[in-house]
Design a protein with these regions (language model features):
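Scaffold signal of the M16-like zinc-metallopeptidase fold and its non-catalytic homologs
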Residues: 1-36, 56, 152-153, 207-240
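Buried hydrophobic packing residues in well-ordered domains
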Residues: 26-29, 41-44, 56, 102, ...
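Short beta-strand/turn micro-motifs at beta-sheet edges
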Residues: 27-31, 87-90, 145-151
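C-terminal regions of mature proteins
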Residues: 40-46, 188, 192, 197-291
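Active/ligand-binding-proximal structured segments within catalytic/core domains
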Residues: 102, 111-125, 131-134
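M16/insulysin-pitrilysin zinc metalloprotease superfamily fold
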Residues: 126-128, 147, 151-208, 275-279, ...
Length: 291
């Protein structure tokens, strides 16, 4: 990825870019990238469509639609995730905790295996009932929590497992992450799948009873061009999913060998231990924020 990718820049900017921002830049952005033509609106409430449209008449009159450039398509669609190293250690001198992040690029929300991936992640790290929390927190006491998730949209899609651990057990914690992730496919069982199915179905049926929840569903349909019945499609996928299918998803989308590791911590005391795990090429990165 590196500094050549748009993904290497914070979305809210840096001190340098913010300092250089001018009023003309803001006006130019408004002129070239903001328009009702790229806006999407979702509504839940006691008004019918005719009443909602009427309430927007003044906005339609005073803010004329025009074609503008979609920056998401221009930058994110072409962004590549090709790290040069397997493990990046970001030095934070004197840190009493180490932050561990392990991940890989993944599928978009519209991919066939998008929801199955969410299903298999449930027992891995979706909550405090997952293996990561159970082993790193409850069994070893290395952290207050350890979790994993798939972030799915149209462009910047990835899997990530993470935790903040005591600095003195950085090596041990990273070894546990490796063992859990690399062994998850063999460990995953019919019992895991049945428990996940029961948990998700129980919560899903009652999760769209409020206007706010319904609005969230409409926003998903709007933002990602999903089918109107995408939630019911997910229910059917979950009910029909087999253990073999789950294991196939794990092998494809949770392959530890494809993942990149980032550790933020005190390099003086922890880097040697991390290197001793022989997880691949290690690159030491100096943290400018600590200077």
């Amino acid at each position: 990825m590196g500094t050549s990718s748009i993904l290497s820049f914070a979305a809210d900017g840096t001190e340098k870019t913010l300092s250089a921002l001018t009023l003309d830049d803001v006006k130019s952005y408004y002129e070239n990238h903001l328009s009702p033509s790229v806006a999407k609106m979702s509504f839940v409430g006691g008004l019918d469509q005719k009443e909602v449209v009427a309430s927007l008449a003044s906005l339609e009159k005073n803010w004329k639609a025009k074609e503008v450039k979609n920056l998401s398509t221009e930058y994110l669609a072409s962004a590549e995730w090709k790290p040069e190293s397997k493990l990046y250690f970001i030095d934070y001198p004197g840190a009493r905790q180490s932050y561990i992040l392990i991940g890989k690029s993944s599928m978009s929300i519209k991919a066939a295996d998008a929801y199955p991936a969410v299903v298999v992640n449930d027992k891995l790290g979706a909550s405090s009932q997952g293996l990561l929390f159970d082993i790193l927190r409850l069994k070893h006491g290395y952290t207050y929590g350890a979790y994993s998730n798939f972030t799915q949209g149209l462009y910047n899609n990835y899997f990530a497992a993470r935790s903040s651990v005591q600095a003195t057990v950085t090596k041990e914690s990273l070894a546990l992450f490796r063992d859990i992730l690399s062994g998850y496919g063999n460990l995953y069982s019919q019992e895991f799948l049945d428990q996940t199915r029961e948990t998700i179905l129980r919560t899903m049926y009652g999760s769209f009873e409020t206007p706010k929840a319904l609005l969230g569903m409409l926003r998903m349909i709007n933002a990602y061009d999903l089918a109107d019945d995408y939630q019911m499609q997910r229910v059917q996928t979950l009910k029909a999913m087999t253990l073999d299918q789950a294991k196939e998803v794990i092998a494809k989308d949770l392959n530890f060998d494809d993942m990149v590791i980032v550790v933020v911590g005190d390099a003086k005391s922890q880097l040697a231990g991390v290197k001793s795990l022989n997880l691949g090429k290690v690159e030491l990165v100096q943290n400018d924020a600590t200077k």
